[in-house]
């Protein structure tokens, strides 16, 4: 899927960050820690591509969440483990840093989550709003 096609997917949210990719990733990981969530992994996909002799724009995937919030979701909908822990992609799009993720309401719809369980994912929007705020 080309990046322009991804921008048309209503289930994917993309926001513009005023910081460079590395700065956005650093701010995100700091925010995750400050909120008491668990940082599971940070994958610098560009660095991995370079190790394979390939070129890729700056592309970093951050995996994080709260087992207290995610476990009930996975217990109710086991296939939701395909999308959990939560992931945020921080990437360079022709000199602009973008932050993309699967919308919490799209995840809730995909796995037919109750309103209570959907609420366990909803904080992602506020987190990314704060991330991209100047």
PLM region descriptions:
Residues 9, 57-59, 94:
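Sequence-level motif detector for i,i+2 pairs with an aromatic at +2
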Residues 25-29, 74, 125-128:
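A generic alpha-helix structural signal
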Residues 110-134:
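Well-ordered alpha/beta subsegment
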Residues 14-15, 62, 88, 99:
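Preference for bulky hydrophobic residues occupying beta-strand positions
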Residues 59-60, 66, 109-110, 116-117:
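Short leucine-rich amphipathic alpha-helices used at interfaces
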Residues 87-111:
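Beta-strand/loop substructures that line and gate deep hydrophobic ligand-binding cavities in soluble
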Residues 29-33, 37-89:
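Compact, glycine-rich, soluble single-domain proteins
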Residues 2-36:
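Terminal, regulation- and interaction-focused segments at domain boundaries
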């Amino acid at each position: 899927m080309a990046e322009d096609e991804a921008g048309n997917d209503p289930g994917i949210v993309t926001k513009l960050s005023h910081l460079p990719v590395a700065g956005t990733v650093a701010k995100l990981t700091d925010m995750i820690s400050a909120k008491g969530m668990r940082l599971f992994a940070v994958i610098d996909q560009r660095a991995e591509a370079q190790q394979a002799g390939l070129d890729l724009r700056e592309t970093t995937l951050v995996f994080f969440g709260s087992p207290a919030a995610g476990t009930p979701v996975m217990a109710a909908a086991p296939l939701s483990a395909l999308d959990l822990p939560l992931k945020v992609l921080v990437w360079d799009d022709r000199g602009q840093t973008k932050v993309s993720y699967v919308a919490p309401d799209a995840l809730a719809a995909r796995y037919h989550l109750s309103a209570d369980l959907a609420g366990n994912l909803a904080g992602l929007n506020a987190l990314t709003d704060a991330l991209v705020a100047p």
